Structure formats: structure tokens, C-alpha cells
Amino acid sequence: MTAELRAADSRGTLICLVNPHATDWRCRIPLSVLAIGASLEGRYTYRVLDGNIDRSLHDTLSSLIRDEGVKYVAFTVMPGPQLTQAIHLSRQIRREYPGVTIVWGGYFPTLHAGVVLAADYVDFVIRDQGDFSFRMLIDALENGGPLSGVPGLSYKDGCVRHNEKQPMIDPCLLPPLPYHRVDVKKYIGRTYIGTRTVNYHSSVGCPFMCGFCAVASSYRARWAGLSAERIADDLTWFREEFGVNAVEFHDNNFFTSEKRTLEFAERIQGRGFTWWGEARPDTLLAYDDRTWQAMSDSGCKMIFMGAESGSAQVLALMAKGGTQTPETILRLAERMRRFGVVPEFSFVLGSPTPTVEEDLENDIRFIRQIKRINPEAEIIIYIYSPVQFEDADLFNAARAHRFSYPQTLDDWLLPEWQAHDLKKNPVTPWLSAATLRRIRNFEKVLNARFPTLSDLKLGPVQRTLLRITGSWRYGLSVYQAPYEVALLQKLLRYRQPELEGF
């Protein structure tokens, strides 16, 4: 009997797949760890632990290690709150159970594998897609095989070694997600798009190379997606099993293929779904009216996309690519208004240009222009925070201002770097304190004048109060010192979707 079959037949749990705490708001199904679990099914015993559901994650892990003999603990790690909990838990496990092997995967360790492995409490990093690589690592460790054959693996062998990158895996070739490993009912909730909303992933990658994007750094302009038929069938299963009536597509670029989008929209028309996804503005603008009508008729309620900047020069520095221009955004805002689909335009303000203050004022004027065309348009504001992307002009421009990342995980726990992770108050040596204040103050006034649709706890009275408080400032372009706006938003616990989920 092979080691993997022995592991699968044993009563204990060999592997814990951990999704660290990321949000205090509505939890989403931890699709990333379920994707890893899919390749372990029938081979190794494993448990999925979600820090967004289990607020005693350390105690749960300790119990499983003690009572069931867990040998491997694997964390998926995004920058921000997940990184903080992953560091603390990994350190505790290493101190209390030094024989347990600790593996990290996800965007943060993919971009910072050397820093992660410099910590004595992380043994291995799986870079990029780990769907098959993680299982291959366990195979090698359980059967005494060579580590050099595991694609995307980084490990310590006298020095840090990085194996060849895992080629992008077509999701059509992957096994179905083991939803039975989590209590799906706990992840279904009320959102702006529906009363029983679930998250779903239908594609990987993106065909563009934006210089501020971790997806572009990992996938290098490649994209692949499930068929429209498969997506529609899966959503029908969710509806029949759990009464789901709304779907958030967490793809990095759901709308890459117009043919797939049209077929999907036609397949789910009349089935009682509403849905949300992420897109490229120029891709959507090129869609035929027939596709737009089908999307609207099928329940497409809101689309998130990167407007980024109202400056063609800044878009070029970002390597936005495609055919996107500021005019693209204005035309799309009008088109989406006609079809009754709400656009969520995200902006990345404060890029390291010689004219950063002038660019900011241009972006503020541009955002106001969008709101005149389509008052329903949601505006999401981020401050540019560099992504480890060695051949990107934008990243190199940041480094020219002496920007550099922390070289230890302990330094990533410092308050300024935790704020950096959330793209709200990043470490940006090229931005003055006055410029940062200008961005934050404009955002406060904008959010008061146009409260986000996604904050469901705001009733008509609260929304009216916000609008009244923000209207005079917005109307006169008076953004400095909006203390009354900040106080009201604090009292109403105003939520920002870019921080707490859309």
C-alpha cells in the first residue's frame, strides 16, 4: 500500500488547509483552498479551516494536530489581514509543534517567496496555481521523492531554491470543487445584488499586463475559462441545493470572451438569478448591443472594472494596454446607464509621476464628469501601492523614489505596511502628506454625496443625511477638512466595499 493510500485510509487528518481571517463582514466560500482540496480528494485525508468562520483557529489547529496527527498545515495568504494571521499562527504552530510542516501559497508568497522562506516557521512556498503542485509536494514528502520536480515550489536547501513556474492550468481540466468540505449555508448572504448570494470562480488569469496588478505578474497575459454550459449548470445546482438567487463572479476578468458571456447570459435568462463580475472597460465597450441586452435580461446588475485614471499618460505608465482611454470610460458610463447595469469604476490615484499633484486634480475632475454622465456609477478609490513586478515601468518608477519592500515578515506586521496592503494608506515616498489628505478628503465627500449602493444597512434616512452633509462640499468642490462628513460616516458605520467586500 502506498503512503498516500495509507494516509487516505487512516482515521486521522494528514493535512489542514487554512484560509486565514480576512473580513469581519460577509464571508465568502474559500474557493482557493477548496481548489487545493480538489486534487487531494481520495488520496489524502484533509480538513478545510476558515478563519472567517472559526474565530478560534489556533485552538482548532492545535486540537487537530494533537488528536488526529496532522502533519501538514497549508495557508493561503493574501496581503492584509490574512498575512497578519498567517504569520501569527505559523509562528505559534512552529513553536508548539516543531514537527509539523508549514506551507504557504497565494498571491503574497508568490510575489515574496524569498522573504517568506527567510522565516524559520515556513518550510515551503507554492507559487502561482497550486492545484496540482501542492499534491505533488505531499507526494514527494510522503514517498521520499525529489522536490526539484514540483512545479512552482520554493524551498530551502542550503539556500532558497525556486523551481520552474507552474504553467497555467486550464480550469476545464481541474476536478470539481469539494463543496461538501465546508458548510455552504454559512457563506450565503444578502448583498446589493441578491438576498441569497454566493461567490463563484469561472476563469483564471487575464489577457492584459497592467503594471500594478499581481494577476498580470503571475499569469503573464494568459486567460482560460469554464464553458458557459458548465457555469450555468453549477449555478443551477447552487439554486436547487441552497436556494441561491445571486452570484458574485470572483474571476479577475469574467468578460474576456464575449461569445462565452452571451451564451452564459442566454442560458440563465428566466432562471431568477442576478449577478456581478469584473471586466475590462474597453472589452465591454466593444460588446454588441445584443450581448448587453442579454446580460441585462439575465440579471447582470453591477460590473466592477478598472478605470484607473483620467490621464492617457498615466494609463500608458500603468501599461493598461488594449484600447482603453479616458473617453472609453465616459462612453461606457453612458452605455451602462442605458442598459440598467451599474458600473463600479476603480481608480488608482497617486502614481509616481513627475506631475502627481496635477494628475490627481485631473482625476478628481474626471470622476466628477463620470458622475454627471451616470450618477449611479460607483467610484472605488485606491492609492497606488507597488506590486512586485520586475519588468513593469510603474514598479520601476516607484523604485526610483527609493521604494522598497520589507525584507522580513516581522516588518510586514508594522502598521504602515498593513495599511499599504489595503491600498488605502500605502508606503508612498513620492506622495506628500498634503496629497494623501487631498485624496482621502475627496473620497469622504464623494462617498457622502453618493453613498455606495452596497451598504445595505443604510436606509433612506441615513442616505439622505449623508447626501445633505456632502452636497454643499461636492457642489462647491470644497474637500478640505470634512470633519462633519467623517463624523457622520463614523456614526453610521459607513462601509467601503474596497475594504470590506463588494
Language-model segments: residues:
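Radical SAM enzyme core and accessory elements
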Residues: M1-L17, S62-K71, Q92, G99, ...
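N-terminal [4Fe-4S]-dependent radical SAM core
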Residues: T2-I15, V150, K156-N199
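A short, glycine/small-residue-rich beta-strand->loop->alpha-helix junction that serves as a flexible
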Residues: A22-L31, M78-L83
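Flexible glycine/acidic-rich beta-alpha junction loops that bind and position SAM and/or redox cofactors
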Residues: H112-A113, F208, K259, Q313-M318, ...
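Structural recognition of alpha->loop->beta junctions
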Residues: V115-F132, A294-I303, N362-I383
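Radical SAM [4Fe-4S] cluster-binding motif and immediate context
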Residues: Y179-P343, L349-T353
